[in-house]
């Protein structure tokens, strides 16, 4: 049987795990990567500008949760590896499974246009045009930095956390009064680093609301190593979780931080092993949300003002697909991507797959590895989704479950519970296999350009 040929955009962990799965199933593919090597967000100083790695970064997911199913992490790894170890793990994976020869580096997909009869016309940065039967989008969602637009002007230096590398680069923060805006993982890491007394003269953190901060260790073990079972009701998980956190670390106001306005699983929690210590030690000072910029300082929503030299905006990212010109395939003005079945398939577009487009707790690293099981089974005729009408109903139910519990915010549009998702995906694959068998196991995407050559 001739298989459809797939174009994969991106050679980060979502792209190369998808490639590995397609290779296992004998499905031809090409991967196009804008940078000169693999790794995406985890490639420090990535020349494509899409990495948010800073020099001191350690992943906040333990090695047990981020490991790929068929390629264990090294036994001598620490619980929370440095980004350089993770990148080496990615390189070892790609080389072990012979994927590098399928990746074209320094080549950006400039345009991906769906053809009326199906399939995709792919225009590359080299000017070359190729045709593919299917498209897998794995361009990541942590690269299009979002900076809020506040009134006023600021005379000092300001950067998004995406650009932060060290206390000296790209802005020298030594001896400066620094404001970090945000309370996400990057905000807490950067604030903790800069708040050390030999670095910033004074460190402020601005946040519109409080968040739940989870410890990295519980009982001497990584907190995510033994998660609650996926079947546990959400309300019970929240009740137990809040009780454990309060018993282990107390309340956020105990450290001079604002009390969270929402329950533990109603907002995106933050994992930090250092921020609470810095806050409790007086090394950083909390401020409410920013009201306006004011020359050499910032005015906050409570009317207070602080003189600052540097602002680090740790204010998140927008979801973007610059190669799509059709708005039906892009995120809307509220940062919501198109409705996707199992976060992968767009009803009515059977030859398009979104890979890794989620904010799964606790990990994104091996998320697309799970999704790729459905994609490979689908392209080889071993899986068939339900009719479009049912797909739409399931999409709504899934989104109500995964994002409905969170307060409305741009950062919460792609939230997801990893373990619950994987369990549901396993069941869906079994149902889809039965549907495919009843339909004669015919691949839903028929090969039109098996060589993926210019037409």
State where each predicted segment sits.
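Flavin (primarily FAD) cofactor-binding/catalytic cores of flavoenzymes
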Residues: 2-56, 72-211, 216-217, 231-388, ...
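A structural motif shared across PLP-dependent enzymes of the aminotransferase-like
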Residues: 55-63
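Short, basic/glycine-rich phosphate-binding loops at helix/coil junctions
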Residues: 64-72
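Conformationally flexible catalytic loops at phosphate/diphosphate-handling active centers
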Residues: 227
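Short, mixed-charge aromatic SLiMs
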Residues: 393-406
């Amino acid at each position: 049987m001739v298989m459809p040929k797939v174009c994969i955009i991106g050679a980060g962990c979502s792209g190369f795990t998808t490639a590995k799965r397609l290779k296992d199933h004998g499905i031809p593919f090409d991967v196009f990567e804008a940078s000169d090597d693999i790794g995406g967000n985890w490639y420090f100083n990535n020349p494509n500008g899409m990495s948010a790695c800073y020099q001191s970064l350690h992943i906040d997911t333990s090695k047990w949760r981020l490991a790929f199913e068929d390629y264990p992490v090294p036994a001598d790894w620490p619980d929370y590896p440095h980004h350089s170890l993770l990148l080496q793990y990615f390189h070892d994976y790609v080389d072990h499974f012979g994927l590098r020869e399928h990746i074209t580096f320094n080549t950006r997909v400039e345009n991906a246009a769906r053809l009326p009869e199906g399939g995709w016309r792919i225009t590359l940065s080299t000017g070359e045009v190729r045709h593919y039967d299917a498209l897998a989008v794995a361009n990541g969602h942590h690269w299009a930095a979002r900076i809020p637009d506040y009134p006023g002007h600021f005379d000092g230096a300001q950067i998004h956390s995406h650009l932060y590398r060290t206390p000296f680069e790209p802005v020298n923060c030594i001896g400066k009064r620094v404001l970090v805006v945000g309370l996400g993982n990057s905000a807490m890491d950067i604030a903790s680093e800069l708040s050390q007394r030999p670095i910033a003269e004074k460190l402020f953190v601005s946040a519109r609301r409080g968040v739940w901060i989870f410890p990295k260790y519980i009982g001497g073990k990584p907190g995510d190593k033994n998660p609650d079972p996926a079947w546990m009701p959400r309300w019970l998980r929240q009740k137990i979780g809040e009780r454990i956190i309060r018993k282990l670390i107390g309340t956020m106001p105990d450290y001079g931080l604002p009390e969270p306005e929402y329950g533990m699983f109603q907002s995106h929690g933050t994992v930090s092993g250092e921020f609470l210590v810095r806050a409790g030690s007086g090394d950083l000072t909390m401020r409410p949300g920013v009201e306006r910029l004011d020359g050499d300082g910032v005015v906050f929503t409570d009317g207070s003002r602080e003189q600052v030299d540097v602002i680090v905006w740790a204010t998140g990212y927008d979801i973007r697909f610059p190669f799509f010109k059709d708005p039906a395939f892009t995120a809307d003005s509220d940062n919501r991507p198109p409705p996707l079945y199992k976060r992968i398939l767009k009803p009515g577009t059977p030859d398009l797959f979104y890979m890794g487009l989620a904010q799964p707790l606790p990990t994104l690293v091996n998320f697309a590895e799970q999704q790729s099981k459905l994609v490979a089974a689908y392209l080889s005729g071993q899986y068939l989704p339900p009719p479009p009408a049912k797909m739409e109903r399931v999409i709504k139910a899934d989104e109500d479950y995964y994002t409905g519990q969170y307060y409305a915010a741009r950062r919460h549009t792609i939230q997801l519970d990893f373990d619950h998702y994987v369990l549901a995906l396993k069941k869906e694959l079994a149902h889809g296999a039965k549907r495919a068998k009843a339909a004669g196991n015919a691949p839903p995407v028929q090969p039109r350009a098996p060589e993926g050559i210019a037409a």
